[in-house]
């Protein structure tokens, strides 16, 4: 999780929804004292895990959030639950899904595609 929310709020949400074993980490903007879409926010997981930004999938239901992650170089996924039109921004997401269950097939497809490149 990478959020503008406070650590206390984020941990409470994760714990109260029994998602403790789902997420490896929770990153809050409080760690860098600045809000998204500042690049320092998106740098946090990159630095911690020593990975390239194009190896990260970033998903959100908020268009500005998807744009920020995508502009940083993350693979952006817009969760469009309401079949809305993407805001008039200078960025369009890589992929659009209607619900989180679609994420499973998206990840599986990417996993299978990675074998084709070996």
Name the predicted role of every residue range:
Residues 2-7, 11-118:
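Asp-based, Mg2+/Mn2+-dependent phosphohydrolase catalytic module
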């Amino acid at each position: 999780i990478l959020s503008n929310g406070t650590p206390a709020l984020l941990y409470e949400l994760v714990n109260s929804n029994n998602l403790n074993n789902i997420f490896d980490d929770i990153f809050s903007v409080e760690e860098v004292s600045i809000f998204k879409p500042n690049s320092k926010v998106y740098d946090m997981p990159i630095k911690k895990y020593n990975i390239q930004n194009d190896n990260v999938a970033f998903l959100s239901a908020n268009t500005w959030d998807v744009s920020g992650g995508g502009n940083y170089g993350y693979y952006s996924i817009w969760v469009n639950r309401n079949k809305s039109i993407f805001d008039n921004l200078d960025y369009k997401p890589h992929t659009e899904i209607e619900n989180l269950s679609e994420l499973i097939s998206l990840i599986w497809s990417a996993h299978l595609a990675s074998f084709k490149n070996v």
